Amino acid sequence: MEKPQLALKPTIMAVLNGNSFAVVAALIPAALISQLLKALPQTGLVGQVEVMVALAQSTLPLIAAFVVGNMLRLSNLETASMALATFVASGVVTVKGDAYMIAGTGVILDIMLTTLIASYVARLSSRLLGQLRMVFEPLVVLLISGGLGLLTLPIMVAVQGAVGQVVAQATRVSPLLMGVLFGMLFAFLIVSPLPSVGIAMALGLSGVGSGAANAGIVAA
């Protein structure tokens, strides 16, 4: 296999495209059937399907790491090491006492940053560790990239939360003004790294707001 290069531009493009793909792959199953499941009788089968689509959303950081690694033509070991670091730093897992809880999709901005850092750390460690990379590379990438991702997680949570608050405030104005604001906001979101699908699902958009968001996305 040809050694992947460390150039910045192709790496950034792979991170952006890979994370965009991961958002779609992880969130679309829930987006398609979550409302339908609420309308159905709450049987054991329906509950199981709800669990399945909820867990699928929590795999977003893993999908992102593997897609980015594939786009950068990284080895299986490098890609798997990236996935470890990205999953740990994503915010999907929270610790409460002795329990580990998996919920949500994680913080997409921190996922993107961690995949960017991990892609470089993985490639550099492969070159430096040589024959020992199978033993030490997962640990090195996890500690360095995952550690940096955890340090930046609170900042990224604040940034993403602020954007969500701005969008939520737009739902409290008159329908005409809300339509204009939602069109503008989602036109911005669709060309930004922020997950427009996730924000729309979190707000439960419907009616004028949903139509305006779709119009803004199409216009962008």
Segments the model singles out, each with a brief description of its role:
Residues M1-A220:
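Pore-lining transmembrane helices
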